[in-house]
C-alpha cells in the first residue's frame, strides 16, 4: 500500500475530449461541445471538463496538457518519467502519436527523459473521441516495477 501511495503522488493525468461520452443507460451525451471545440480536463466516465476551448492542433494540445500537468507536478532536468497517451476509443492512432511526439519533444527540451512510453487505447469511453496523457515521475523502484509482466483488461506488459 505504501508503494501505491508513493506512486499515486507522482502520477498526473489530463484528458481532452473532442466529443462527449454516451452512457448506454442514459442514452444521451454526458456534455455538449461544438464540432470546433474541445473539452479540457474531462473525466474518463464522461464527466465534463474544467473548460471548453476552440479545437487545437496536436502539437498545441500536447503542449497544453504537459504545461497543465507540470503546474501540479513540476519536473526538473535529470528527472525520468513514463508517458502514457491513452486514446478514448474514437481517436486515430496517428493523432495519439502526434500528441506523444510533442510531449516527448517538450520533455526532451527540459532534459527530462522518457522511460517505457505507452501509446494506445488503455481505458476508453463509449463513443468518445479524445485522449488523456499521464505523466509518472519515476525513481529506480518504480522503473523496476514497471518492467514486471502484467496482464489486465486495461494494460498488458509482456516484459520478462
Residue ranges and their predicted role:
Residues 68-160:
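C-terminal non-catalytic interaction/assembly regions of soluble proteins
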Residues 2-98:
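Mixed-charge interfacial surface used for oligomerization/domain docking
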Amino acid at each position: 500500500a505504501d508503494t501505491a501511495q508513493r506512486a499515486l503522488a507522482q502520477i498526473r493525468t489530463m484528458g481532452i475530449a473532442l466529443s462527449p461520452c454516451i452512457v448506454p443507460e442514459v442514452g444521451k451525451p454526458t456534455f455538449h461541445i461544438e464540432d470546433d471545440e474541445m473539452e479540457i480536463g474531462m473525466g474518463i466516465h464522461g464527466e465534463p471538463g474544467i473548460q471548453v476551448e476552440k479545437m487545437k492542433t496536436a502539437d498545441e494540445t500536447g503542449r497544453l496538457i504537459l504545461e497543465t500537468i507540470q503546474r501540479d507536478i513540476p519536473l526538473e532536468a535529470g528527472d525520468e518519467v513514463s508517458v502514457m497517451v491513452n486514446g478514448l476509443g474514437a481517436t486515430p492512432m496517428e493523432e495519439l502519436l502526434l500528441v506523444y511526439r510533442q510531449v516527448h519533444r517538450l520533455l526532451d527540451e527540459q532534459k527530462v527523459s522518457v522511460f517505457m512510453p505507452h501509446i494506445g487505447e488503455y481505458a476508453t469511453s463509449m463513443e468518445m473521441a479524445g485522449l488523456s496523457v499521464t505523466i509518472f515521475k519515476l525513481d529506480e523502484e518504480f522503473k523496476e516495477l514497471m518492467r514486471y509482466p502484467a496482464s489486465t483488461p486495461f494494460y498488458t506488459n509482456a516484459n520478462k
